[in-house]
Amino acid sequence: MVNQCRNCGHFFQSTPNPRRPRLFCSDRCRKAWSRKHQIPQVLKSLPRWVRAVGKRPIQCDGSPASSTDPDTWASYSEVMRSKAGDGYGIMLGDGLACWDFDHVDPADPPAQAVELLSEAIYAEVSTSGHGLHVFVRSSEPSFRRDGVEFYSHSRFIRMTGRRWPK
């Protein structure tokens, strides 16, 4: 039986199982699809998305993206269709802000991160696995204090789709 992967669109051979057909060509595609579907629609609807190489933002064609130039950003769906780079992220601004907690254990988060969940649009584990990003609506100025960074404009945040808390 030939199936088409829900994530990458490639066709793959699978053994027939009427109770549970395979939807993905690999575990990697299954995980990638799951992570893409963790991000809430309120973020997906913003035209502030870019691809990434490491923590550097790039456009869907692979050229550099700028956190201050909306002409270099794209829609979520355009970014997900692109194969440029090795990931994706969002540009902050226009009321979208992010608390960045570095060097923390997501299983034992700081109290401040837990308190922020009540106003969070979305929260996820950072790319290192040892940090948290908590996205909120705010136009307060950016700052850094006590090992916590708050960004509200002109900043790129690489996303993982690893929702926190699970």
PLM-predicted stretches and their roles:
Residues K31-K166:
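Conserved phosphate/metal-binding and DNA-contacting active-site motifs used
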Residues M1-K36:
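BZIP DNA-binding basic region
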